[in-house]
Amino acid sequence: MSSLQKHSIPSFKLHSGKVIPLTLSYQVFGKALHEAPVVLVNHSLTGNSNVSGEEGWWSDIIGPKKLIDTEVYSVIAFNFPGNGFDDDFLTSYKDWILRDVSEAFKIALDELGVSELFAAIGGSIGGALAWEMAVSHPHFIRNVIPIACHWEASDWILANVLLQDRLLHNSQNPLEDARIHAMLCYRTPQSLKFRFDRTINKEQNKFNVETWMLYHGDKLASRFDINAYKSMNHLLGSIDICHDRDSFETCLLYTSPSPRDVEE
């Protein structure tokens, strides 16, 4: 695994006006910075900066001679502030919106000497962050690749964020129950029927759809922190590249790259 590095921003100003000290953690894969074009990878809701290598969550596409070729590119991935991968959590996560994460990453990249990104790619909230960075800094990114995401939190997402927040604060098993509910957000009734079709797990005497959901609840609880989940869930509800700006179409007029939106 690439070593986890830190970058400090002594006085970081949030969109709300609050000024805080901030330390970001990140990993670099492939070519060293300044030796090759740079690809920024933004992780998803419960992901982290470990995107490549034996335990990398995106190692199928990031690595030597893979889609994002680490023999050609410098790949950098930051941890969202508060995601807990670096054992650091946000004490006041509700002060943050996704645009703050965008600005923090941009400041860090500037201070690391990265003058341009060949690409910014991410899925879920990571893709929404790529949207935000492209609009906030339109001449900084040559290719924007948001995957399975939207440029604003829809009413469906906002409703689910509310329910997730209530589960995280009120449930006796908050991580497990929030993840079980989230799994339904990632699937449709048709996809569940196609995969399970009311089949039974005879060993557990449960429907396979039930054991699948319980498995994912337990799995997340074993590797993720509830404070990180609360922070990331809050940021999910703050997605909006048009916040304090004009319309979506106007925002795109000032964006130099052509976004390549990818749906799952």
Language-model features: where?
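N-terminal cap/lid subdomain of alpha/beta-hydrolase-fold enzymes
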Residues: Q27-G84
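Conserved acidic catalytic loop of the alpha/beta-hydrolase fold
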Residues: D100-L117
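Cap/lid segment of the alpha/beta-hydrolase catalytic domain
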Residues: D69-V72, A77-E103, L162-D165
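Single conserved hydrophobic/aromatic residue that forms the stacking wall/gate
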Residues: Y254-E264
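Active-site nucleophile elbow and catalytic-triad environment of alpha/beta-hydrolase enzymes
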Residues: S231-T250
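Alpha/beta-hydrolase-fold enzymes
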Residues: F140-K219
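Catalytic-loop region of hydrolases
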Residues: M1-V38
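Conserved hydrolase catalytic core segment
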Residues: F118-A119, S124-P146, E152
